[in-house]
């Protein structure tokens, strides 16, 4: 609830590091925001929600004439992919679309995302907990590490993506 996102400690490491200083060493000591107002913004982070995925293989392959050379094929695929992605989000500026090739370029899927850019650090354990065991224990089970960090997604008053603003509110899933 309230827009919380849990991820691995190493995935949040750069954000934790960017907020750290000699005075406030959040990597060494950890971080906890005891109120919404103390959560730390992260301008380089965003969270993407997958809205839908669609198989567009037929539309992509129909645009490629039989016998097309590989270099020309790549240009056609790139061009039609751009067009399909633009069509998919033409009526909604809050969405982003991309075409991904699968199986060596024999299948193509359109994915539509909604990106939230106001993401704030809520909690991070000290690195001694979040990275306990280091690479030695990374692929060994059972693991005994607190490998997590917590962020919160914020949205505008209509629960839509927005740039950082103190007026934004925690995101609530539909």
Regions from the PLM with identified roles:
Residues 1-174:
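Terminal presequence/propeptide segments associated with secretion/organelle targeting
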């Amino acid at each position: 609830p309230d827009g919380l996102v849990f991820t691995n400690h190493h995935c949040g490491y750069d954000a934790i590091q960017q907020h750290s200083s000699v005075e406030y060493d959040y990597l060494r000591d950890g971080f906890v925001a005891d109120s919404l107002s103390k959560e730390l913004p992260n301008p380089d982070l965003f969270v993407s929600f997958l809205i839908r995925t669609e198989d567009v293989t037929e539309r992509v392959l129909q645009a490629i004439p039989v016998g097309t050379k590989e270099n020309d094929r790549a240009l056609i695929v790139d061009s039609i992919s751009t067009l399909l992605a633009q069509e998919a989000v033409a009526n909604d500026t809050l969405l982003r679309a991309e075409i991904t090739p699968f199986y060596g370029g024999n299948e193509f899927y359109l994915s539509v995302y909604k990106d939230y850019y106001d993401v704030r650090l809520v909690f991070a354990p000290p690195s001694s907990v979040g990275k306990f065991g280091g690479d030695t224990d990374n692929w060994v089970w059972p693991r005994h590490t607190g490998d997590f960090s917590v962020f919160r997604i914020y949205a505008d008053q209509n629960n839509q993506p927005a740039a950082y603003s103190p007026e934004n509110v925690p995101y609530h899933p539909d």
